[in-house]
């Protein structure tokens, strides 16, 4: 039973699918039919009718014939073929030959697409021809006006174009012939060729108009402005030479001649209407002439610099020499009192050597200024180098002097530090005296002796001649560590002794009742009398805490309160 249902359902499904598919194929036939009718109704005849308004000769006639034949072929042959194919597709569908029908419909769609492009191309070409004829007619009038204006300007202002006027004449006459050519081509119906003539004319007249704007200005530069600047440069150069400037290195006469030749070259280019090249050369010439002005101005500025810097540098070097002498005396004095490292002495000798070299260079420059054979710009360069070297040397010299002063300052600081440590040691001993201890433990006595020895070592280093500051600093570091350690040890020892004494006193209340406490306290007293305050405190605390836990905290608290009252 189930199997029969499945077969039935599958059969029903196949029938439905078959029906839907056929319907879709018929719809596609209708769409292609509509497309074919649409193509047949395109306004190609109307477009071709517009062409007939033009001169139906030459190129236009040939094009019209080609388009008309193409359209006739589409309407009479190609579209009826499509109609035939659509009819075949319908027959195949009726016979349920779907695959063949589908393939045929695909071919029909491709054919219609190609026909669509062909029709589009015909309409586009027709519009291009008509458009180019309209545009050319409008533009040729504008170009005639531009040509007339150019001829008028050339006639009225011929002198402003110099020798370029003849070639401009030739070019404008050549352009005039193109108007005749345009008329002939239009008459012959060759509108597309006529359009090319319009575009060529437009370009040529644009070029000529631009040239006619630029030539007078360029001629002005080459015939008046630039030669005047060269003459001014030549005068300035001669005048400076007469005033004693050394300018041989500028090779000015040869350079000016080169510029004059360049101007001639530029005029020849204008004559040949090579205007862009001429503009380039004029721009270069302007830059080069500016550079020559700058060179002469540099010499004037360099002369001023040399005049003002020479006396200033002479003064600076004298001042440096005097300072170096003072430094030498100071170094000798310091050397007797202090130990100077070999590198420091070497630095001073190098400063001396540099100073002599700088003086020698300055005298050489002085001689060259007096000789008046060297350009001021070159002398200025040498002086600038000398100035930077003098500045460097001043800096080195200053560093050396600072180092000498630092040595003496370091000695004073070292003596101050030694005094401070002596005071710290005296303060530690005063605390010991004030606390009235029965005696000093041996380790403490050894530390005290060590601290005193370290202070004596610093004092001895400070008495040495010459003074070796790195060794003094080393001794100071060691003494500082020893004294600080001793002071801390003193405070700690006094605290332990006082707390031991107070804990023993506090524990006395338990002596009679507790033999163990008595024994512990007696031992603590024995240790106290033998200066072992740390162990005495430990024993006393252990004995008292045995019978009264927390007793040591109370003793400590009372002692801290007494201390704060005393302070």
UniProtKB/Swiss-Prot annotation:
Q: Which organism is it from?
A: Geobacillus kaustophilus (strain HTA426)
Q: How does it sit in the membrane?
A: Single-pass membrane protein
Coiled-coil regions listed: 98-159, 251-497
Family label: Belongs to the EzrA family.
Listed name of the protein: Septation ring formation regulator EzrA
> Per the record, what ranges lie on the membrane's Cytoplasmic side?
22-567
> What subcellular compartments does it reside in?
Cell membrane
Q: Which domain of life does this protein belong to?
A: Bacteria
Q: What keywords sit in the KW lines? A: Cell cycle, Cell division, Cell membrane, Coiled coil, Membrane, Septation, Transmembrane, Transmembrane helix
């Amino acid at each position: 039973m189930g199997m029969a249902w499945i077969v039935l359902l599958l059969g029903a499904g196949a029938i439905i699918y078959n029906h839907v598919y056929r319907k879709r194929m018929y719809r596609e036939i209708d769409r292609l039919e509509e497309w074919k009718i649409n193509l047949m109704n395109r306004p190609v005849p109307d477009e071709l009718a517009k062409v007939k308004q033009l001169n139906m000769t030459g190129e236009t006639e040939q094009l019209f014939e080609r388009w008309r034949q193409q359209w006739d072929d589409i309407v009479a042959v190609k579209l009826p073929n499509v109609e035939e194919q659509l009819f075949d597709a319908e027959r195949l569908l009726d016979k349920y030959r779907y695959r063949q029908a589908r393939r045929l419909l695909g071919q029909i769609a491709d054919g219609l697409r190609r026909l669509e492009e062909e029709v589009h191309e015909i309409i586009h070409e027709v519009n291009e021809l008509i458009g180019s004829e309209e545009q050319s007619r409008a533009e040729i009038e504008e170009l005639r006006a531009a040509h007339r204006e150019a001829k008028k300007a050339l006639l009225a202002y011929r002198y402003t174009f110099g020798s370029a006027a003849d070639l401009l004449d030739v070019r404008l006459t050549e352009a005039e012939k193109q108007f005749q050519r345009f008329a002939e081509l239009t008459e012959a119906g060759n509108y597309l060729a006529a359009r090319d003539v319009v575009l060529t004319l437009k370009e040529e007249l644009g070029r000529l108009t631009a040239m006619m704007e630029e030539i007078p200005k360029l001629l002005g530069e080459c015939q008046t402005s630039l030669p005047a600047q060269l003459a001014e440069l030549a005068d300035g150069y001669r005048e400076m030479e007469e005033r004693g400037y050394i300018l041989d290195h500028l090779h000015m006469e040869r350079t000016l001649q080169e510029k004059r030749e360049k101007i001639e070259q530029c005029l020849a280019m204008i004559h040949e209407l090579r205007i862009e090249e001429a503009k380039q050369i004029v721009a270069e010439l302007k830059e080069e002439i500016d550079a020559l002005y700058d060179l002469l101005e540099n010499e004037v500025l360099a002369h001023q610099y040399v005049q003002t810097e020479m006396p200033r540098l002479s003064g600076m070097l004298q001042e440096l020499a005097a300072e170096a002498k003072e430094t030498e005396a100071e170094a000798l004095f310091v050397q007797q009192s202090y130990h100077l490292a070999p590198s420091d002495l070497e630095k001073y000798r190098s400063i001396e050597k540099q100073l002599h070299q700088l003086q020698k260079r300055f005298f050489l420059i002085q001689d060259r200024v007096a000789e008046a054979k060297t350009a001021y710009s070159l002398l200025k360069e040498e002086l600038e180098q000398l100035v930077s070297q003098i500045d460097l040397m001043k800096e080195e010299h200053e560093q050396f002097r600072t180092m000498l002063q630092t040595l003496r300052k370091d000695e004073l600081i070292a003596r101050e530090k030694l005094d401070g440590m002596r005071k710290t040691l005296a303060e530690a001993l005063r605390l010991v005296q004030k606390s009235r201890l029965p005696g000093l433990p041996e380790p403490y006595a050894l530390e005290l002796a060590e601290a005193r020895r370290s202070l004596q070592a610093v004092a001895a280093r400070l008495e040495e001649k010459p003074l070796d500051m790195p060794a003094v600093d080393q001794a100071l570091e060691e003494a500082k560590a020893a004294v600080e350690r001793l002071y801390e040890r003193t405070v700690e020892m006094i605290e332990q002794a006082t707390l031991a004494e107070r804990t023993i006193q506090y524990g006395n209340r338990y002596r009679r009742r507790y033999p163990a406490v008595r024994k512990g306290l007696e031992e603590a007293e024995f240790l106290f009398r033998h200066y072992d305050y740390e162990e005495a405190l430990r024993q006393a605390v252990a004995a008292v805490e045995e019978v009264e836990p927390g007793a040591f905290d109370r003793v400590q608290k009372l002692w801290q309160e007494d201390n704060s009252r005393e302070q």
